[in-house]
Amino acid sequence: MTSFATILTQHGETLHNHDHSHILEPGRMMLTDAGAERVTNYCSDHTRTVPVGGKFEGRQKDVYNIVLACHDKALEITRPGITYMSVHLEVCKVLVQGLKDLGLMKGDVEEAVAAGAHALFLPHGLGHMMGLDVHDMENLGEVYVGYDGQPKSTEFGRKSLRLGRKLEPGFVLTIEPGVYFIPELMDLWRGQNKFTEFINYEKLFTYKD
């Protein structure tokens, strides 16, 4: 059986989108977030994004490669003894550099991440614990499960990281970076002149499609 309700959508800009009312259209990207549950009740959680029709069009491959670089960076540095918060932040630096290369962000990479400017494109955390539940033991409280009793950040984006604690041998966790273009959030931040020193809104708004 599935470990959670499958997310299958060409509207990946809507997080946890369970609306299946649309027909897949050529030229769009399809996001699949799905998992299976074993007879022993252990869960899996896999997220993939592929082009409808099998071929990238226009700028899709550029954005896909940024996400891939973020994923590979996380695999490279994730190990026991470091915090998952530090992994998350290093991945965010890769994200910002990739977006700078596309002309969507600007300025100093570390300053942009420290300020939280990257959260326009990644408004959630890198991953979470996984086990008998997809978000393992989350009902006990994220502060206890994901942060070992330490307080969570209240910053937009970073506060949605479900796992920030020091990693230990035997932990099972997900690595789920992404790049999102959320029209409503883009409009809001631009209207507030938010992080104009880091975000190239003029170029960004050409990605609204």
Residue ranges: model-predicted function:
Residues 1-209:
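Active-site neighborhoods and metal-handling regions in enzymes and metal-associated proteins
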